[in-house]
């Protein structure tokens, strides 16, 4: 019985690690999309930047882009 508990614990830990890896991949993908839009991912945009949203990473939820002068 103790062997089965150890295996269950390791499988559970592996699933948690896999979930973290897939979240990191999507955050990197969204950061690349923001880069293509000539923006960058930040927690807060500066006053002369516009929030376009889209990064959705835990620490950097916004894609900030410079405002265009009209």
UniProtKB/Swiss-Prot annotation:
Coiled coil: none annotated. Pfam families: Defensin_beta_2. One of its GO terms (cellular component) is extracellular region. It is found in: Secreted. The keyword NAD does not apply. Disulfide bonds join 41-55, 45-64. One of its GO terms (biological process) is defense response to bacterium. Keywords: Antibiotic, Antimicrobial, Defensin, Disulfide bond, Secreted, Signal. It comes from the Eukaryota. Residues 1-26 form the signal peptide. Its main location: secreted. Has antibacterial activity. Belongs to the beta-defensin family. This is Beta-defensin 107A. It comes from Pan troglodytes. The lineage of its organism: Eukaryota, Metazoa, Chordata, Craniata, Vertebrata. The gene is DEFB107A.
């Amino acid at each position: 019985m103790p062997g089965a508990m150890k295996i269950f614990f390791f499988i559970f830990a592996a699933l948690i690690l896999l979930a973290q890896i897939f979240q990191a991949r999507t955050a990197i993908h969204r950061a690349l999309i923001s880069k293509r839009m000539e923006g960058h991912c930040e927690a807060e945009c500066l006053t002369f930047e516009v929030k376009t949203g889209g990064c959705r990473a835990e620490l950097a939820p916004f894609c900030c882009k410079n405002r265009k002068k009209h």
